[in-house]
Amino acid sequence: VRTGLQLRPLKSGGSGVQTYSKKHPQQMPTALEAGTLNGHGIAGLDAALDYLKQTGMDEIREKEQTLMWQFYEGIRDISGVKIYGDFSQKNRCPIVSFNIGDYDSSEVSDELFEGWEISTRPGGHCAPLMHEALGTVEQGAVRFSFSHYNTDEEIETAIRAIEELAQDEE
């Protein structure tokens, strides 16, 4: 920190340096540390950064895009499935949101987990205005988020599961 510049801590509280003092330490950098540092988080962040450098963001992005498009192509023509979003762009966020008929999104998500151990995020996704615009305030939507850790086989299983659920809804 530049000489003469005063920084105020975002939070203050216990300190590992002056444990029993009722006043927060004033010396830097301890003055900016409230409580115990998240050592596990710091170590995890370091490992994550090493992994990203080794694997490469381009490789990760390409894999996520490939899986997302595989999934989209696999469900887009299933009767009763309504997909939300702009799929006219080749590169997009590797997320697909959809509904199956009038099926509540939470029910679809539960069925996917119970029948196929597929984890999804149903509901309003902290985006009430989006759901208002889509007309899905009551139903919500089912969201698949793809990672480069997912496999082609997992995507094919998800497509088959959605086909089966859509048939059951008819």
Where are these regions (language model features)?
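Pyridoxal 5′-phosphate
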Residues: 1-170
